[in-house]
Amino acid sequence: MARLTARRRASVAVALVVALGALSVGAWALGEWKPFAHPSAEPSWPANIAPLARYVEDTTRVRFSAHVNVEFIADAQRFLDRVTNDDGPSAAALANSATDEAVGRALGFWSGEPHLADSAHLLRTSGDTGVEWLPEEHVVVVRAKDEKAELSPIDRADLVMVLTEIADDQHYQLNERMDRAPTPQDFQVLAGLAIGEALWVLDRYTSRFDNDEAEVYRADRSSRGKEFNDAVTSVNLTFRSLRVASQTVGTAFVAALHRSSDGRAMQHAFTSAVPAAIDQMTMPVHKYGQRDPLEHVEPPAVPAGGEYLYTRQMGPFGVHLLLAGGVPPRDALEAADGWGNDSFIAYQLEGRVCTDARIVADDKAAADRIEHGLKAWAATRPAASQALVGRDDTTLLLSVCDPGAKAAQPTLDAAASDQFLDRADLLRDRVSATGQPVLSECIAVRFYRDHAAADLRGANPDVNPFEAIDTIGYDCVSSV
């Protein structure tokens, strides 16, 4: 299906720009989190940090294996100057983001000029915090006078989260493994595990707050969240969703694993039974527990006359977003659940950035759903994109080109990403409420198969979300 024209390249970008945005720009944005050599010293802690470190060790059953330096800075501006060591996007990041932007326009994720490198920088540097981990310096910086200072509930909670990340990194070498991750899915899985475990421990810790502490914590967390959201309103919604996908999915996955019968389930997930992709994390019972393997896929060839730029992987969330450009988010999610693997290339041809992709489905029925969504997506692309869709058994093929920053085209709204990410949130909520991952997964999958994400927020007057969840829950009890 390769085409010798510029439209060919944009086609591949359609499917993989999601992973592209999350990995190409995202990896730069996460560049501060890199592997580092841990000093070989017996861990010791300041007086106001020691109880938090012990709590992390007791909760995770992971022991700190190396000393962690702690630096106290009470002055807000000095603290900010200390932890903000970022001169903005590098020349390489800016160059890569120009290609990423073109691929995203081809795929219909955004139009115009979204300035992805600047957006990644803004997401990373926005928001107030009283705790920062500087891994390359082997130090945690705390906004407080000294080790005798009384820490606020939110700062103690953030320290618990950061200390969990550090302990897991020391024990499982997560930073080094993420740095060496061969595919975007490998990277996102490890990031999701790390962040998901840290947030799980944070939730356990904050649940111990008394009423006064809990009220102060909620108010501070809400205030910081609003400040962050206000600061990043200019960032494209689809790009923002790409940046939080692994965190959202990982948090639900970790919650489910901690409820499993095997008390070592998290240890296995970090080591001998690492999820193959985030689709296994979205369905920890059926896709992870039953080990849904990745299908084999070969990257498309660069068409004659094209200049190769890079190869990426879209992943199930990327495929979902792609399909949501042509069919309702409910249908896009059901189709994306049949993702088996994918590979796409970005290249330049006749002065334009294009992309070709191969998406392998789990089976024929899944391929039928993905094909339907891709054809609907192609029909919405501007004529200048020259979008093509093909099929070879259970492998779907697509080719599309950047229509240009001035091209008018439909783009994704929040409903597309919400359908995927909110399902993970519902899974986490049900696991917390019922303690039963099998039942919880059944409820989450069926609710978002039958309903739009907005239904859970009461946007549809014909749907009572609580009654719907209860009804689905009764059905699931009898079927799982």
What are these regions (language model features)?
Residues 56, 154-174, 195-199, 254, ...:
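Active-site recognition of the HExxH zinc-binding catalytic motif
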Residues 140-160, 186-189:
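Short pre-active-site segment immediately N-terminal to the catalytic Zn-binding motif
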Residues 52, 169-175, 179-221:
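Post-HExxH zinc-binding segment in Zn-dependent metallohydrolases
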Residues 232, 416-480:
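Mature extracellular/luminal domains of secreted and GPI-anchored eukaryotic proteins, especially small
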Residues 79-97, 115-140:
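Catalytic zinc-binding patch centered on the HExxH motif and its immediate surroundings
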Residues 340-343, 351-429, 434, 438:
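C-terminal soluble interaction/assembly domains
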Residues 2-20, 26-31:
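N-terminal Sec-pathway targeting helices
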Residues 230-352:
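Pan-zinc metallopeptidase signature
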